Swiss-Prot record:
It comes from Pseudomonas syringae pv. tomato (strain ATCC BAA-871 / DC3000). Pfam families: Ribosomal_L25p (PF01386), Ribosomal_TL5_C (PF14693). It comes from the Bacteria. GO terms for biological process: translation. Part of the 50S ribosomal subunit; part of the 5S rRNA/L5/L18/L25 subcomplex. Contacts the 5S rRNA. Binds to the 5S rRNA independently of L5 and L18. Keywords: Ribonucleoprotein, Ribosomal protein, RNA-binding, rRNA-binding. CDD domains: Ribosomal_L25_TL5_CTC. Belongs to the bacterial ribosomal protein bL25 family. CTC subfamily. NCBIfam families: bL25_bact_ctc (TIGR00731), PRK05618.1-2 (NF004128), PRK05618.1-5 (NF004130), PRK05943.1 (NF004612). GO terms for molecular function: 5S rRNA binding; structural constituent of ribosome. GO terms for cellular component: cytosolic large ribosomal subunit. This is Large ribosomal subunit protein bL25.
Length: 203
């Protein structure tokens, strides 16, 4: 049994106006499902069920069993459009998962070993919190682990430094883009008002 499931219904009332009515009157989230050998489907889901699913970070990079009017299909989240102020989901895109066929997905990054550079007086900055990967459905990782324990002040972790799980390829690297993932820098020194006043008086 899939740990991540979502119920949906087909919708025929399309367009921006229809989507707004769904959200306002029925507390539904409009979405589209595409990919595989089937035609795209416009669907709607209960907003509260979508919110509950997304409470688990793993749902963003996990195969979801989508039940559309009694017909089940495996999908992954491709894109989410959120309200700019409130943060709730306004629209979702799902891509069908086909066994034996590679997919691309956005996977969260988990950083470990941050205590070591901090003890050396550094501060760790996360340049990115997620990565796009390409793999077969069976190899889709829940997250990508990045170890920063060996970093010194001034060091940077690039995507090429990160070990990809077996069967997984980083899309950015495949396109020649060696992204910065994290860096360690010296803490910024902020002078307080008394110090600045004393320096001003000395001048």
């Amino acid at each position: 049994m899939n740990d991540f499931t979502l119920n949906a219904e087909l919708r025929s009332d399309l367009g921006k106006g229809a989507s707004r009515r769904l959200r306002r009157l029925a507390s539904l989230v409009p979405a589209v499902v595409y990919g595989g050998d089937k035609a795209p489907e416009s669907i709607s889901m209960l907003a509260k069920e979508v919110a509950k699913l997304l409470e688990n970070e793993a749902s963003y990079s996990h195969i979801i069993e989508l039940n559309v009017g009694g017909t089940k299909q495996n999908v992954i989240i491709k894109a989410l459009q959120r309200h700019p102020a409130k943060g709730h989901v306004l629209h979702a895109d799902f891509v069908r998962v086909v066994a034996g066929q590679k997919l691309t997905a956005i996977v969260p990054v988990h950083f470990i070993g941050e205590e070591a550079p901090i003890k050396k007086g550094g501060e760790v900055s996360h340049v990115t919190s997620e990565l796009e990967v390409s793999c077969l459905p069976k190899d889709l990782p829940e997250f990508i682990e990045v170890d920063v324990s060996a970093l010194e002040i001034g060091s940077i972790v690039h995507l090429s430094d990160v070990k990809a799980p077996k069967g997984v390829e980083f899309v950015a690297l495949a396109h020649g883009n060696d992204l910065a993932i994290a860096n360690v820098h010296a803490p910024r020194v902020v002078k307080d008002e008394d110090e600045e006043a004393a320096e001003g008086a000395a001048e």
